[in-house]
Amino acid sequence: MHQRHKTLILIALLLVFYVDGFAQSGFSYSPDSARFVTSDIDKFWKAYDDFKKDTTVNTFGPEYIAVGSEGVAGFTPNRIQSAEHLYQVVKKRKDDYAKVRANTLRIKEKEKQSRSTFYALKYLYPAAKFPPVYFVIGAYNSGGTSGKQGLFIGAEMQTNIDGIPGIVAHELIHFQQTWPGGDPTLLQQSILEGSADFIGEMISGAHGNEAANNYGNMHADKLYQEFVSKMNGTDYNDWLYGTSKKDDRPNDLGYWIGYQIIAHYYARATDKKQAIYDILNIKDYTDFLKKSGYLDKYLK
């Protein structure tokens, strides 16, 4: 076969593999290709200004949700919920939205710093995928999440825009994780959140929940005993996403204990890049906990 033909065939095969790999992931493996989308913020404020002219009219359906990006579509289930729900929240919290307006319009200033976390992750985890980051305005119930469309950041919740790179980093790690099927146990969910905090901190320099960290370190023994007794169940109360305030405990102690598990696993590892891979691709969470050595004296 002529050498030129061989070269053309090789190039074609490489293109097929490249396109196939990109299609399977849906997103690029290059941090430079990730989009940071803030256009939904402008759409929200247009709807908000029109709403203020006549508060009996719900402008958020036609002017925001219907014309929003994939980020708005992805943030709607379980967060924005519906145009009617957003309308009712804005009516009740109109002044709160007004107070954060200036901050939301400055979010694009943090794109360069946020993208730097993507480069840092690429170094630690070459298999990382980099989806779009959508900054949207929601119903004051979520600071961020990730989904099949990408990363979604609730702009109205970001009272300090300097914290945005840390939020983006946390959600970026969630996007890379292998998630367990069904309803995750308290152990699984705590490890998932803790690993997003741990690796997110590595790539952004942003520290996690100070209140949970301080409380956890002060009451560690009691919390370890309680966690071990509950970790195989799916009741997150007093550990994740809410608290009864018993013992004056703060929210999200599961993040704290998950972080500790990950930190111990990483510290024990001789191959740090392999450890990052292991953390993002956990198959057996009980085995992972045992390998970390954390909580050994509490496990029976």
Name every feature range the model reports, one short phrase each.
Residues 41, 45, 115-118, 193, ...:
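Extracytoplasmic/secreted envelope proteins and their assembly/folding machinery
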Residues 1-28:
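Bacterial Sec-dependent N-terminal signal peptides
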Residues 59-64, 68, 228-300:
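Pan-zinc metallopeptidase signature
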Residues 44-54, 63, 67, 120-127, ...:
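Structured segments of extracytoplasmic/periplasmic soluble domains
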Residues 140-143, 216-222, 282-287:
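Amphipathic alpha-helical surface "interface" segments used
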Residues 24-83:
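N-terminal mature-domain "stem" immediately C-terminal to a signal peptide or N-terminal signal-anchor/transmembrane
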Residues 84-213:
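Acidic/His-rich structured neighborhood in mature extracellular/periplasmic domains
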